[in-house]
Regions:
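Surface-exposed loop/turn motifs in large extracellular/passenger domains
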Residues: 1-193, 197-220, 224-228
Length: 228
């Protein structure tokens, strides 16, 4: 986490963090994110990172716990996260997203949203209810998932890609963008779990060539943009 502990002014945090290849982060505990980057901080991570992974192919952490509200990759305010190719990121608890652009508007930089760039061949998964693999909730934010990604959700109300409208004391959240690279796949298994969902004003969700979307649960649409 890029802000000092107990410092409520984290939207002003700044600096650059550089991490090489083969990073491994494992967290267990409610509201315990793998990465939580704030303010104007830039985080650069190399290839083949592993964050919040599944152990031995089973849907549990090493101690058997799940963690609610614990995201794998999270950027707040106008922070930037860049991760190289081969990322594996998984979450197990409820309301726990794999890639999350969050925290709406900054009072110091209200037009600057958070940015997340994920390299080729990412494997993103969530197991809990209300847990999306890619979640956009940042004013003017942007998420780019490069080609060949695999995105899988198992829980109910868990979308592959979501752009949600939001409001806060700092103002409304709008105009977020998500780009999904060519040859990527999106699969959802739970009820009410859409492949791609958008209700954010001004949001732009772009799917490149040969993106495949599969949904299995009841009331789970491939693409849904509801009327507000």
């Amino acid at each position: 986490r890029s802000n000092p502990s107990g410092n409520s002014d984290w939207q002003n945090a700044s600096g650059t963090i550089n991490i090489g290849d083969d990073l491994t982060i494992t967290v267990s505990g409610n509201s315990a994110d793998g990465l939580n980057i704030n303010g104007a901080t830039v985080l650069n991570i190399g290839k083949n990172a592993t964050i919040n992974t599944l152990y031995n192919g089973e849907l549990k952490y090493s101690n058997g716990d799940t963690s609610d509200g614990a995201h794998a990759v999270r950027a707040n305010f106008h922070a930037t996260i860049n991760i190289g190719e081969g990322l594996t990121a998984g979450t197990l608890g409820e309301s726990s997203h794999a890639v999350y652009a969050a925290q709406g508007r900054s009072t110091t930089n209200p037009t600057g949203g958070s940015k997340i760039n994920i390299g080729k061949g990412a494997v993103l998964s969530t197991a809990g209810d209300g847990s999306h693999t890619v979640m956009m909730a940042s004013n003017n934010g942007k998420i780019v998932i490069e080609e060949g990604a695999e995105m899988t959700t198992l829980g109910d109300g868990s979308h592959g890609v979501a752009a949600y409208a939001d409001t806060s004391a700092k103002g409304s959240v709008a105009n977020g963008a998500v780009e999904i690279g060519a040859g990527s796949t999106i699969a959802t298994a739970g009820g009410g779990s859409h492949g791609v969902f958008a209700n954010m004003t001004g949001s732009v969700l772009s799917l490149d060539d040969n993106v495949g979307i599969t949904t299995e649960g009841d009331a789970s649409h491939g693409l849904l943009a509801p009327v507000s």
